[in-house]
Amino acid sequence: LTLGEPVSPAEEIPSLLDAGGKFFRDPLRQAAEAKPEEVELELRAQVATFIRLLGRKPTHLDSHHHVGRHLPIRDIVFALAEELGIPLRCQDAETRRAASERGLRSPEHFFGESGPEAYWSSERLLSHLATLPDGVSEFMTHPGCFDQDLVYSRYGRQREVELRGLTDPAVSEAVARRRIHLCHFGQLT
């Protein structure tokens, strides 16, 4: 809801779009000014497109720029996750608490940032793995290779540092040594 073009026809969700027909990039603006019925229409269209293209439900619901944690969008995301019977990403304790109260599944802990410096260097990964709390933790990562598609992203070149960190043999060894079980959202119970 905060980057690119919608799946829905622009005329059906005008409160979500700028004059060029693209989503406003500001999650707080979207939460404050987007019409809830238009948010729901677009989210349903995105899920329907996912199911049509992949032939299955998504493993979880997530939102770019964390827009899904802001009311009233959060309630729409929660209702859709309930309807689909799938978990969701919860970036903060308040969202996790609210999701848990509704019986929604989510990792118990969330770690990650996307600022001017790469977050998941090998050193930071090793430090987090050494002090990982009990339960399921999500590490929000943005690994990748810098290319023309990322020139205008504020988190472009940092992706290569994260890719190196996540594929560092020392990180894999730390995961094995600590008997950490890697999983995906579809495995949350």
Feature roles, as predicted:
Residues L1-H60, G68-T189:
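Terminal accessory/targeting
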Residues H65:
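Active-site histidine-anchored catalytic micro-motif
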